[in-house]
Regions:
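Extracytoplasmic cell-surface/polysaccharide-interacting catalytic and binding patches
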Residues: 1-198
Length: 198
């Protein structure tokens, strides 16, 4: 397979890998601009500027399919990540929390490039973890078009052995349009990109 780094048509600016083997490094993100927005539960959250711009384009496209999407989570600092883990332990149990919430320092949400998406049904935002059977079929409608807006489904089905994170139909990651298109066409994960180029 062609080495992506040698393809001048593919922009790798946003192709930073954060996972359990590659912890978050704040220096990698100093070049990006961040903005404040409102989450689906009306909290003020932070997201990378270009990521949000392309999310709005994706949102407009989904409206044409009568699907309303919004952002529940974007950037989370380490304190917020630990708090989320503790909340999940209380609500869903430690085993589930250990699977679904990445350890502090290894979450893509530290970057502001990863978004957890919720859908609105009957004028109400629906929790993914509590209503998976309802939201998953709706969220799947956006998966085939994510790459057109520079996003990938970060944790697709049957990828847990590589990503170490179970299937999350709501978790999308901005990597830029050219790379997203390449990964989509070649059915690759972000980890595969690194294995090819390192």
């Amino acid at each position: 397979m062609q080495n992506i780094m040698k393809n001048d048509n593919i922009n790798t600016t946003y192709a930073i890998l954060v996972n359990r083997k590659n912890p978050y490094n704040a220096k990698d993100y100093e070049k990006f601009k961040y903005i404040n927005i409102k989450s689906t539960d009306n909290r003020e959250i932070i997201v990378e500027n270009i990521t949000y711009k392309h999310f709005l384009e994706l949102k407009d496209e989904m409206k044409k399919e009568n699907v309303i999407i919004g952002i529940k989570h974007a950037l989370r600092d380490k304190i917020e990540q630990q708090s989320l883990y503790e909340q999940f332990c209380i609500k869903y149990g430690k085993d589930y929390a250990d699977k679904i919430v990445c350890p502090v320092g290894t979450s893509e949400h530290h970057t502001g490039l990863a978004l957890d998406i919720e859908v609105k049904i009957d004028n109400e935002w629906i929790s993914n973890n509590d209503n998976f059977d309802i939201t998953e079929p709706i969220l799947k409608k956006m998966h085939p078009i994510l790459h057109k807006y520079g996003f990938i489904l970060r944790y697709p089905k049957n990828s847990e052995k590589i990503t170490k994170v179970p299937y999350e139909p709501w978790h999308i990651r901005y990597i830029g349009k050219s790379l997203a298109q390449y990964l989509y066409e070649n059915k690759l994960l972000l980890e595969d990109f690194y294995n090819i180029n390192n």
